Amino acid sequence: MLHRFLWASTLSLLATGPVFAMCTDCDFSGQNLAFADFRDQDLSGANFSDAYLIDAKFDGANLEGADFSGARANNTTFRNARLSDVRFVGAELELADFSGARMAGVDFNDAFVRHSKLTKDQALQSNYCQVPLRDATARGTLCE
């Protein structure tokens, strides 16, 4: 029954587009939010740990202090998002797009970051260059 409810809530989210104009400290941990549209939402302090976020959109969102630990966020976009103090510990971020995102204090410890759009300035603002990562591509050029 719970599984059906979670699936229905995911479908509702997909059908209506952005529905959380402001959802600070919300708990989305472990949820299937593939293709979810969180563009321009205030999700500061939200918990997305262990969530399935494939192809989700967080463009322009305020995610300051959010937790994405263990999340699968492949092909997810964070364009122009506010990501200060976000935790991506152990997250999968293959093909993630961080274009224009503010990333001061972002924690990438043990994250899988591959083929993602990340600038040298963003890498230096976060701990990207100081922590162990799983198969980070282009790390050498960003951290030199």
Give the role of each language-model region.
Residues M1-S9:
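Bacterial N-terminal signal peptides that target proteins for export
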Residues A8-T16:
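Bacterial N-terminal signal peptides
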Residues G17-E144:
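Tandem repeat scaffolds
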